[in-house]
């Protein structure tokens, strides 16, 4: 037989008073954690914007190969095959600004879980226009073939308007891989893990 427990008005009042305090406590913690996450995010975005690859692609089809990936020939915007007027960096910026903070309370402490985009998720929003399933952002780090047949000229056949792939070989040489998003994100994740390890008693 189940025992019934009566709730006195005094007990009910204590519970009602405790709920707002608990909500205020949780909100205060979340605001503090969010401030730290935004600071780490700010550093990530600053490093992303000043990276030579970002600068070069942001310069569009008339940019120069400041990243050194093409041996000074043409630019990444036209080499990747981005259509004139497109903003290939936009989806990356949107993803880098995303985060989710969740907290789990116990009697002794509050555990923090922070979710931010992975490199794999970002690679999915940076497709190579001419190679289904491949990412240009990942290709910066692993290599993008075609430098030998790349011709940096104004052409109506070009997506960007300033670069085409020819049938015959134009030069020797190969794409020079560069560290990019994976490296930037690795440092970002270290900062996020430090914030997560913060336990609040």
What is each model feature region?
Residues 1-201:
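Short, Lys/Arg-rich flexible segments
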